[in-house]
Amino acid sequence: MKTVLFRQHGGPEVLEYTDFPTPEPKAGEVLIHLQAASLNRMDVFVRNGWPGIKLELPHINGADGAGEICALGSNVSNFKIGDRVVINANFGCGKCEFCLSEQDNMCLDWHLLGETIRGTYAEYVCVPDRQLYKLPEKFDYHSSAAAALVYQTAWHSMVKRGGVKAGETVAIIGAGGGVNSASIQIAKYLGAHVIVVGSNSNKLAQSESIGADILINRSKEEDWSKAIFIATKKRGVDVVVDNVGTTFPLSLRALRKGGRLLTVGNSGAPRFEIDNRFIFAKHLSIIGSTMSTAADFREVMDLVVTGKLKPIIDETFPLKEAAAAQERLWRGENFGKITLDIP
């Protein structure tokens, strides 16, 4: 099969478009002929080399993918050859206490497709059948791949962990990334009022086009927490979605008393200082999560395929141009998701 892989960690130059053996499905697995894959910042982190990451080289990037089942392993009864599917990249073992209590994103032997398991920058991939969602006949593969990881991540964080409710005000820090564009739509779907803080006027305008009510340009408002206080009549917001990390100090300031800070990542940096006095004096909660449960994935994909949530695709590259796609992602030029077209 054709694939894009790397044989050593490094910059985009280590990515190689080449032939690689097509995998064969084991018991409980299916082989998918992929039609689309979607990029995540994790792809670049893995390519560069996480400290302590353990994976088999050569490695294939890619958590998100959608396509058609072309072969079945033994003991697969819920799907058939020809089914159109999208992949849930959140791999639990299916056996531990967390998986058995339907908290598979907390699995004791948790893996993410494309991180420690060869992923979707390829013509074919094998995955357990429990990781699949069956797509309607005409639903677009690229939209499916663009939705899978970011929508389940944002849904689990905002709905199941954060408890965002209609009438609340949610501030989303950053305009452009896949999780944040999903978060804007999910917050609006839930009936919340949305403030987006960003530094790019074009991306802020695009955020408004998908539902943002108030835009704050942090390149003009260095202390944007004050701008949020003014916008909320000195009350503060109920919820801040902050996946940057280094912006936590201002996010804590922007929250009302009893507010919640939700986080699923740290695109800025993993280590930074915060003032604990804001947390205990304002009765704040910091709520982290990773990915979602299988039930959350099905729930949010139901909303996607019925058009209640609409994935934003920034640009599509041919598979062989994955390096250029990653460079665009890393430069932060995208609004929404970048996808790969797989022949």
What is each stretch, according to the model?
Residues F91-G174:
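NAD(P)H dinucleotide-binding glycine-rich loop of Rossmann-like/cofactor-binding domains
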Residues P21-A37, W50-L100, C126, P136-K138:
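Glycine-rich beta-strand-centered segment in the early N-terminal region that forms part
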Residues G174-A175, N266:
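NAD(P)H cofactor-binding loop motif with strongest signal on the N-terminal glycine-rich segment
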Residues T153, G178-V179, T247:
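Hydrophobic/small residue at the entry helix of a nucleotide-binding pocket
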Residues M1, V170, K308-I312, A324-P343:
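C-terminal capping/lid region of NAD(P)-dependent oxidoreductase domains
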Residues I172, K188-T247:
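Adenosine-nucleotide cofactor-binding segment
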Residues G198-S199, N243-I312, D341-P343:
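Glycine-rich phosphate-binding loop and adjacent beta-alpha segment
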